[in-house]
Amino acid sequence: MAKNNTNRHYSLRKLKKGTASVAVALSVIGAGLVVNTNEVSARVFPRGTVENPDKARELLNKYDVENSMLQANNDKLTTENKNLTDQNKELKAEENRLTTENKGLTKKLSEAEEEAANKEQESKETIGTLKKILDETVKDKIAREQKSKQDIGALKQELAKKDEGNKVSEASRKGLRRDLDASREAKKQVEKDLANLTAELDKVKEEKQISDASRKGLRRDLDASREAKKQVEKDLANLTAELDKVKEEKQISDASRQGLRRDLDASREAKKQVEKALEEANSKLAALEKLNKELEESKKLTEKEKAELQAKLEAEAKALKEQLAKQAEELAKLRAGKASDSQTPDAKPGNKVVPGKGQAPQAGTKPNQNKAPMKETKRQLPSTGETANPFFTAAALTVMATAGVAAVVKRKEEN
């Protein structure tokens, strides 16, 4: 009966396996448990206590509560131990990071100390040079003072010998005073010259640094200009060859179509476009010449203004290169169109157009059937099939713009 009652109130799942077995065995045979944080001890109850199931249950419940509290305490300590372990890992990682950062800072400090030592050495050398100049100046001044003293001594001796002549003596005293004043003025002048030499030395050093930087920049600009000139000359040669070929093809095309009115209109329109392109090219050439003058005047400008002017010139050169590429592409398209047009017969048999005469409509056809094709041919060149904007406008503009760039680059290189 007592065994059945005690089994209903056991709550030993949270105890260790050995502790639970001992507790169950002791409770069955009539023993009590005393549970501490680190150990489980057993003591034998008197016979009367074992025979009292209520008291045994009360003790077991009490031990169960204490065991639960200890288990909760143990879980809490385990969690805190885990947190402390994680914090320890983080602190170690932070320590490693700080150690690495300390090494980097130590290296930077060493480099800074080395740079400071180099600067200090340069300063010492400069001070040594100035000190040498100062010593030479002081020696010169001392020599002059010695000479002045010797002159004064000689004058004094001469004055002692000529005491009888008061006028001569007075004149000698005045001359001595003048020499003394001149000596003092010479001393002041020497000190002033020394200060001026020191200032000029500093100024010369600064100008030398600026001159070195400017010379390097001008050398880079000259090299870039030479490369740009070579590229422009190469592009100009290619475009000139293309232009000659296109001109030859145009002459052939014009010779075969001199009697057509629409070619004359297209030629007039092309002339207007060429004149307009010539004006644009002249304006661009004037702008390039202005930029060249600004480049020549940039020798007196600051480094910042030189950089801005160089960027402007590079942007202009880039725009011209893009224009050259675009126009070369247009020339290629025109050549392809001309080649396809040369393979097409000029007119169908029976529909040959006589220059200066209109074509009568065929029998059985309406007169307005050919209006749309005629309107279309007026908007196109017969040789290439392109629109009324003549194909040689782009070529002329390319040649003139390229020639202007080449002239500017040549002037820049000569300057």
From Swiss-Prot:
D repeat extents: 311-316, 317-322, 325-330, 332-337
Pfam families (UniProt xref): Gram_pos_anchor, YSIRK_signal
Gene3D superfamilies: 6.10.250.460
Disulfide bonds: none
Motif (LPXTG sorting signal): 381-385
Proregion residues excised on maturation: 385-415
Region (Two directly repeated 27 amino acid blocks separated by 15 amino acids): 211-279
PROSITE patterns the UniProt entry points to: GRAM_POS_ANCHORING, SMCR, SMDRR
Main location as per UniProt: secreted
Residues that bear Pentaglycyl murein peptidoglycan amidated threonine: T384
Topological category with respect to the lipid bilayer: Peptidoglycan-anchor
Gene Ontology CC annotation, any one: extracellular region
Ranges where the record places region Disordered: 75-125, 157-189, 202-231, 247-277, 332-387
Chain intervals for the UniProt region annotation (5 X 7 AA approximate tandem repeats of [KMNR]-L-[TQ]-[TDA]-[ENQ]-N-[NDK]): 69-103
Bias type Basic and acidic residues, positions: 87-100, 108-125, 158-189, 260-277
Stretches forming Sequence repeats: 69-75, 76-82, 83-89, 90-96, 97-103
Region ranges (Hydrophilic): 280-343
Biased composition annotated in UniProt, kind: Polar residues: 75-86
Subcellular compartments: Secreted, Cell wall
Keywords of the record: Cell wall, Coiled coil, Peptidoglycan-anchor, Phagocytosis, Repeat, Secreted, Signal, Virulence
Key word Protein biosynthesis present: no
Region spans: Binding to CD46: 211-279
Role this protein plays: Mediates the attachment of S.pyogenes to skin epithelial cells through the binding of the human membrane cofactor protein CD46. Also binds to the factor H and factor H-like protein 1. These interactions could contribute to the fact that the M6 protein protects the bacterium from the phagocytosis by regulating the complement activation on the bacterial surface.
Name the UniProt record assigns to this protein: M protein, serotype 6
Gene expressing this chain: emm6
